[in-house]
Structures are given as C-alpha cells and as structure tokens.
C-alpha cells in the first residue's frame, strides 16, 4: 500500500492509502499531492493538473503543499485540502463517491473525503479524531494514519474561532509520496 507523509507545521503525519479498495479516490489524492513538472510546461489532458479556484489558472504543482487545515472540530476531525482555505474551494472538478463495506469511520485516524453531498468529492479531506460511524456511506474512507496520530491530536486540540477555523495557522508545508 502507498504511504504519504504530510509534513505539517505541527509535525509529520504519515497515512497509509487503501489503493486496493478505494482506487479512484487514492489516485485523486496522489495526483493532487504530487507535482507534475510536465503540467507546468504544458497543462495537457494527459498531465496531472488542477484549476486554481481564485485565479482560474491550470496548475501542475501539489495542491496540498501550502494548504491549511482550515476546519478543526475537537474530538471530531481536522479538515484540509482546500486551496482557498475557506472550506469552499477545490480542484476545479468533482468525482463520484467510492464506498467499501469494510471501510468505515470506526476509530481515530481515518482519512476520508470531505464533500458537500453525494458525488461531490474534490480535494478536501479530513482525519477523524474519534469514531464517527454516522459518516459511513456519506464520506469515503480511503486511508488511515500509520504514524503521527499525536500530531493529528495536537492539531485537533488547536483553539478555534468562528466557523471552526483555527486561531493559529496549521499548514501542510510539503508532501512526500512513498511509492511501493
């Protein structure tokens, strides 16, 4: 299974991705995590790109690098992956839900897609701080924390203000994809 390390302003979080049970969702996450130099030179259909929601620019860099954990709810989850940091941004496309019977929100450390309804997945994701079974069948689990759950918990304990926004900026500074 593929692992990805999110190097955050609070420390490293390594997640194991469920390539075999959520292949489309994992592929999307990896595409947004990686930098595709070919897309920088020529953003063609065969390159990995996303559209900046603020400028409309087609980009090939990692959407996640520099993105904030923009929503933190104590004992529930930490959410990131929005290039605008507002909770309303995404990669310029949406894709269908990908649920698997044995992948549920049955504990802390589950990596899942954030969405605004059925089949509206894009770039936003969250990591659970506790079991959240009410999210099963609504948000697709596609990985889990392998190392750095203490960092997830530290981010989850960050004081928040209006709209569950952290008072201190919590960033994904860089991303490392550990291919098999």
Labelled PLM ranges:
Residues 1-180:
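Cyclophilin-like peptidyl-prolyl cis-trans isomerases
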């Amino acid at each position: 299974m593929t692992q990805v390390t999110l190097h955050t302003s609070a420390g490293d979080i390594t997640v194991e991705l469920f390539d075999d049970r959520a292949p489309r969702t994992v592929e999307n996450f990896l595409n947004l995590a990686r930098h595709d130099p070919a897309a920088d030179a020529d953003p063609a259909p065969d390159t990995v790109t996303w559209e900046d929601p603020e400028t409309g620019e087609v980009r090939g860099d990692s959407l996640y690098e520099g993105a904030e954990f923009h929503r933190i709810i104590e004992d529930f989850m930490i959410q990131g992956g929005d290039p605008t940091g507002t909770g309303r941004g995404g990669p310029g496309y949406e894709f269908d839900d990908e649920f698997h019977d044995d992948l549920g929100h049955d504990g802390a450390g589950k990596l899942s897609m954030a969405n605004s309804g059925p089949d509206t997945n894009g770039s936003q994701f969250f990591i659970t701080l506790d079991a959240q079974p009410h999210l099963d069948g609504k948000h697709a689990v596609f990985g889990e924390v392998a190392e750095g759950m203490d960092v997830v918990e530290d981010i989850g304990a960050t004081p928040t203000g209006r709209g569950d926004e952290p008072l201190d900026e919590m960033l994904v500074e860089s991303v490392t994809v550990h291919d098999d």
